[in-house]
Amino acid sequence: MTHRTRFAPSPTGHLHIGGARTALFSWLYARKHGGTFILRIEDTDLERSTVESVNAILEGMTWLGLEYDEGPFYQTHRFDRYREVMEQLLEEGHAYRCYCTKEELDELRAGQMERKEKPRYDGRCRHRSEPRPGVLPVIRFRNPTEGEVAWDDLVRGRIAFQNSELDDLIIARSDGTPTYNFTVVVDDLDMKISHVIRGDDHVNNTPRQINILKALGVEPPRYGHVPMILGADGARLSKRHGAVSVMQYRDEGYLPEALLNYLVRLGWSHGDQEIFSVDEMIEYFDANAINHSAATFNPDKLLWLNHHYLMHSDPAHVAHHLRWHLGRLDIDPTEGPDPVDVVVAQRERCKTLVEMAQASRFFYRDFDDYDPKSAQKYLTAASVPALESLRRHLAVVRSWEKEFLHAVLVATGEEMGLKLGAVAQPLRVAVAGTAVSPPMDVTLHLLGQLRTLNRIDRALQYIEAKKD
């Protein structure tokens, strides 16, 4: 069997966490079975669909590494095809024109609500043959009235609906534009989609889509409906729970593989394993192992995963992403140490790339001010002898390598009768502007001799100026 899956977002906003997880599951399913992953843009909502949203979706997919094999296909390019299938359904008696006015439908609904019945269209135009003057009709699918429609869901097992529960769905509006449930069916048919993995908010759409496909004489794809994602308070995940856009996580300093790893574990598991490479995700992924209940989004767990990936990923890979974050701070990475070396120095104490970029600014650019508390504690008259001694030794050190720099620090402490920390902390504040940095020999090595000496000179001037 050829496996063909699709991700079909509507371009009315950014790629959000729920959509990204759906895309990931569909992508993994295709990759696991050697199949094809298709990207389809469902842009028939002309009022809300924007080019900016399309670009945001494509950018998010690229950043996550979810490459698609076919597409992107746009529904707005396929209106002629939708009209063709619509006419086929009309000619074969599977669809009909409905001339009911809004007032009639409102009256019908009000009566049903009053009788505590489920609001639904009663099919009154099923047998109407004559058009009504001045009324532009919609087109409705003639849903079967007997029997049931059922499918073996990839996630939830057997699901069945009685056809008597389903009314005659509108498949074309009065202006002729097709509706969601109809375009999806035609697209899945034409693109030979074999498996559909999507959110469980689509469960009620599935029986309608299956019936339309059967009316067209084709076998429906296999469906799998994934439970929604909740916030910690049990409500559906939204902006009030924090970031929901994939690219917002990039902007906040997360690695794409950390977010992928978190998303794949959000409702799916493989034993007790927490960390998955992409290859392992593909190897182990099984739609049957997706949980039936909603998953709860835990930002602390995502942050933990991100730190894990910062610690254990190839430093060159992390540095590639760090350069982007340095650029956001208007820092040119060529005007200082190699970002690969910065990653190695900083990753143990930084949980995000934003933290790492901000903590590494002093390597590339002189700072305007010292951290007030650090300067008050360490840049004092008592620190001057140690800073002056360090300045002399560092100016003539044989090699600007870490072991020689460490030796200078130790020798200065012994010479001054001070512990290493009493020597290193004033120096750290002098060169980094704060009392927090990588180990002192590493910091000096990355900073370079000229910058180090200039900053010691500046610190000594700062201390002198405080006397006045």
From Swiss-Prot:
GO terms of molecular function: ATP binding; glutamate-tRNA ligase activity; tRNA binding; zinc ion binding
Motif ('KMSKS' region): 236-240
InterPro entries: aa-tRNA-synth_I_cd-bd, aa-tRNA-synth_I_codon-bd_sub2, aa-tRNA-synth_I_CS, aa_tRNA-synth_I_cd-bd_sf, Glu-tRNA-ligase_bac/mito, Glu/Gln-tRNA-synth, Glu/Gln-tRNA-synth_Ib_cat-dom, GluQ/Sye
Keyword Lipid metabolism: no
Location(s), subcellular: Cytoplasm
GO biological process, one term: glutamyl-tRNA aminoacylation
Motif ('HIGH' region): 9-19
Residues annotated for ATP binding in this entry: 239
Residue pairs linked by disulfide bridges in the UniProt entry: none
Reactions it catalyzes: tRNA(Glu) + L-glutamate + ATP = L-glutamyl-tRNA(Glu) + AMP + diphosphate
Protein family membership: Belongs to the class-I aminoacyl-tRNA synthetase family. Glutamate--tRNA ligase type 1 subfamily.
Protein function: Catalyzes the attachment of glutamate to tRNA(Glu) in a two-step reaction: glutamate is first activated by ATP to form Glu-AMP and then transferred to the acceptor end of tRNA(Glu).
Name of the molecule in the record: Glutamate--tRNA ligase 2
Protein's organism: Methylococcus capsulatus (strain ATCC 33009 / NCIMB 11132 / Bath)
Gene of this entry: gltX2
